[in-house]
Structures are given as structure tokens and as C-alpha cells.
Amino acid sequence: MNRQGSARSHLTLALCTILHGFTHAYGSMLVPLYFRIADDLKLSGVGAATLIVTLYGAVYNLASYAAGLAADRFSRKTLLAIGLLGNAAAILAIGLSRQYSHILMLGVAAGLFGTIFHPSANALASSHYPKAPGMAIGILGIGSGLGFFFGPQIAGWRAATASWQLWNVAQWQKPCVEMALAGLVVGIIFLFLGTDASGAPTRRRGAKIDPALNRRVMRMASVLMFRDFAGVAGLSLAAIYVRNVFNLHVSQAGLFVGIMMLPSVIFNPLAVYLTPKRRRLPGLTMILIIGGLLAGTAPLWPLAGALIILCAFQTMQLASYAVSDAATLERISPEFRGRVVGLFLEIAGTFGALGPWVMGAWADHLHNSHTRFNYFGPFALISACMILAAASPPLIARLGPVLSAIKPMEEISPETMGVVP
């Protein structure tokens, strides 16, 4: 194994993980700020504030197949850098705009750049580690936990404590400005230090994908979309729930939402490692069912108990992404991975993106939004969606056999983590 190539691959995977963190931080940072956004912009309710995140997520996923086509043809490293730089620029503009309509349009722009990440990053990470694509995806998944943790936490903290003044920037906008500037710096660093897999051309004609494979991916996505809805909806519902029921301050709500996501930093790669080969799909079924059962009990608990339950739910929820992504990409030839990820997200992710708006509108129409037992309905919906998604493993299996079998205790050994020669 070429040591220089190995170092480049390790660095690229580490940087992709950081980019993953920024991508999800930008997508979740407004969640604890819903009430401040609604008050500052004089909106009709929290549902109008959630529409910003809903539009971001909808565009992020609707354009995923086009992003997948690009990932299978052009330099994935360059695409990832462009994606983060554009996403950060749009978030910066959100932090400077005072018009709700402009902010909605900027949410769309941020989603268009954000959509580049998953098709390109999943394909790039797995192509750097062809002997252990599952573990590469598991490590990449650490970034989602970091982003979902730091995004809401930093947003809530800085919205409460930032003291700098610039034009008419509101308190809730200050974390947007700060995190956008950080993303611009990281995007430039990645552009110069990230690498495509050795020997991969920077521009290539995409191999023609089998229409039957597309149909199998669409069937899989039509079931896993309920998992995606549960995760995105659960994040927004948690922020609304703790603000209304437990009267948490914006910084406390941000910390609550962030802590919910933190264990996935460890559990995502661990879940992939503990479910190799034939364990992968049964493990996914178990993760989805446990997560669904946990979510339905959230309104039964006081604040501390709700934190534990929702933390466990989101750990299962995010782990299901790492495991299902690994199970899928292990069955897909490298030249098709960008398009497969893009097609999946276009269906499952777009449906999931409706979650924030559905939860915000539901909360606005509750008879008494400050009583925790009135939230049984929304949490039951999330629970049911997770359990429905547990029907997905047989559909993943129909994608085909695992292309490169890795023994359980070898998946993260130096030999199997070898890079493309």
C-alpha cells in the first residue's frame, strides 16, 4: 500500500467528515431559533419559521439526483468544495437579510449547494477505501452527529450571548454569520487539501446505469423515506416541545437538541462495525424498531427523562443512516454510487424534508401547546414512521450481493483500509 496515497485518503476522509458536520450544522442550526425568528420577523407562528428549514431540506433532496450525475462525472473533491462554499455563502446572506421572503429564497439557495454533499462525499469516501467501503461510510457518518450537535448548540448559545453589532443583524442571525465564515474557511482548505481517489479522472463519462437498478433504489427509498421523515421531524419537534412544555431558554433548547445528537458521533461507526456482512440488514431492522418504540414514549417523561429517551431515539435514527448507507453502497459498483445516492435522496429525503413544517403547523394548532401529553400525536407519528421503515432491509438486499466481503474483525485493520493503488 502506498503510504503517501494512504495519508491522502485518510486526510480526505477526515476533511469529508468535517464537511459533513458543516452540512448538517447548517441544516439544523435554525431549529432552536424558531421562536426568535417568528418574533423578530413578526411571522404568523412557529410553522412559518419552520418553512425556512423545510424549503432548505426539500431543495437539498430534490436536486440530489442531478448532484449524483455530477458526482459520477466530475471531480468529487471540487464539487464538495463548491458545495460547502456556496452553502456557507447562502447562510451568511441569511444572517444579513431582514426580509422573510429573501430568507426563504436564500434557504432554497443553501439547499441547492448543500445537495452536492451526500452524492459526492459518499462516493468519494467509499472509493478511497474500496476494501472497506462500509467502515468509510461509518467514519463519514461521525460528521452528521458532530453537525447535529454543534449546529443547534452553537446557534442557541451565540443567539443568547453574542454581543457584537453589525448593521441591523438580529441576535438569531449572529450565529448564522459566525458559522458561515467558519464554513468558508473550511471550504477553501478542503479545495486545496482534499483529493479524488488515486487514478480517478477529474472528468469522466458516466457509465449507463441499469434501469432495473433505478427501480430497486426507488422502491427502497419509498420505504426508507419514513425513516427520513421521522428524523427530520423529530429534530424540529424536540426543539418546539422543550421550548413550549419546559419553557427552556434559546441557549438551553439548543443544548438540549445538540446533546440528543452527540452519541451518534461514536455510535455511527460502531453500528457499522458491529453489523458486518449478514448482520448488516438484521441490525438495521433492530435499530429502526428500537428507535421507533423509544420515540413514542417521549411525552411520558419529565425533562431529564425526555432528554435520555430522545437522545436514544436520535442515536438509533442516525445509526440507521450509517448502516443503511453502508449496506447499500456495498452492493453498488463505484461508478454508479453518486447517482444511486442522489436518486435515493431525491425520493426519501424530499419526503423527509416535510417534517419541520408538519411539526411546526401541528404545534401551532394544538389546543394547549404547553401540556406535554398533547404531544402524543406527533411523537406517535414519528414512532410509526420508524417502524414502517423497518420493512426496508429486504428491499436493500434486492439491490444485489455485497461486492466485496470483509471479515468482521478485519474491516478496520490497516490492510483492509488500504487505498486505491
Predicted region positions:
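Extracytoplasmic gate region of multi-pass secondary transporters
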Residues: 30-31, 216-265
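Cytoplasmic membrane-interface "Motif A"-like loop-to-helix N-cap segments
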Residues: 73-84, 276-288
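Residue-level signature of mid-helix packing/kink "hotspots" within the transmembrane helices
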Residues: 28, 57-65, 148-149, 261-269, ...
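Helix-loop-helix hairpin linking two adjacent transmembrane segments in secondary transporters
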Residues: 139-195
